[in-house]
């Protein structure tokens, strides 16, 4: 059964990282329900782990229609294009070529350099003095510099990429013209880098993408450009926000910080658990569209209707995760959906894991006494954005 009147959506408060209680209520009483977002069409909202995983992994739910539909969303502008808007077979073709180049081994090989970068950033924080803004000086710096290393961008140009990435960030206070200018400069730079790697390949990801082959198939020039910039943008905002959110939780939950200080070997599993526990989005983005009538929990989703599969709610489903609202860094198994599921499972998950593990490892090693430099009630949180996180995180140690 579903209620007659769609509920206003999203449910989460942007100030903080709590998961709205409405999700748990719906899991119990109406796991497939109608919602009305502030922009776009009404949609079906799916909240139980089993159902969310099924929707994300079922070929009867696709992303392609998002290119032409007024898709349900929490922000006025629509995010279109890229791998996330494609369906098989075109999506399969591109992903197959990218996976040949962007391997878990390649991500892991960046761990030593990621550590060096993290230590350099902490050095700069220490030199600046206390309080230091962890968001500006660490969380926004580490991901873009690691991605630059991955792509093969020379160190001398890292600051340029940091500026461009900052303009792409949904929390950035820039005009549409400034964002467009940053995009044009980033595309021009990456086009030049691709040309150089065609002539003189190295062991970086751009060279590997240029050389990627699947039988007689290869990436076109535009596909190379879109993928390289897409990796930068997709990998930047999410990991930046996760670093800030995870450190915020360590500072506001002393027992959690003490546990990781005493047992740093738990950091990899802590990253998995925090990825599960933190409902990163204000709401659920990137709807899937039914290509035929599908019945889920006794509810018929008609062909063409959009479905929002809430991974944030699924990751707190008590039926899948015992004591789901508790952060348990020893939790096993932990088959969370923080990086998605199915054909659109996050390509950058191995790199994100490396970055998040290194961030916690280095910060706890270098700044074991790290704590908030202002009262928690004075923190400013991003508003009107896709992802939830503090705009600044003043810290002392």
UniProtKB/Swiss-Prot annotation:
Changes seen on gene knockout: Cells lacking this gene do not produce mycinamicin I, mycinamicin II and mycinamicin V, and accumulate mycinamicin IV.
A Pfam family of this chain: p450
Cited function: Involved in the biosynthesis of mycinamicin, a 16-membered macrolide antibiotic. Catalyzes consecutive hydroxylation (at C14) and epoxidation (at C12-C13) reactions with mycinamicin IV as initial substrate, leading to mycinamicin II. These reactions require prior dimethylation of 6-deoxyallose to mycinose for effective conversion by the dual function MycG enzyme.
Regions of compositional bias (Basic and acidic residues) in chain numbering: 68-78
Cofactor(s) demanded: heme
Family classification: Belongs to the cytochrome P450 family.
Record GO terms (molecular function): heme binding; iron ion binding; monooxygenase activity; oxidoreductase activity, acting on paired donors, with incorporation or reduction of molecular oxygen
EC class: oxidoreductase
Keyword NADP: yes
Binding residue positions for heme: 91, 95, 288, 344, 346
Name of the featured protein: Mycinamicin IV hydroxylase/epoxidase
Keywords annotated in UniProt: Antibiotic biosynthesis, Heme, Iron, Metal-binding, Monooxygenase, NADP, Oxidoreductase
UniProt-annotated binding residues for substrate: 81
UniProt pathway annotation: Antibiotic biosynthesis; mycinamicin biosynthesis
Entry keyword Heme: yes
Example GO BP: antibiotic biosynthetic process
Region feature Disordered, mapped onto this chain: 63-86
Organism: Micromonospora griseorubida
Tree of life domain: Bacteria
The protein's Enzyme Commission number: 1.14.-.-
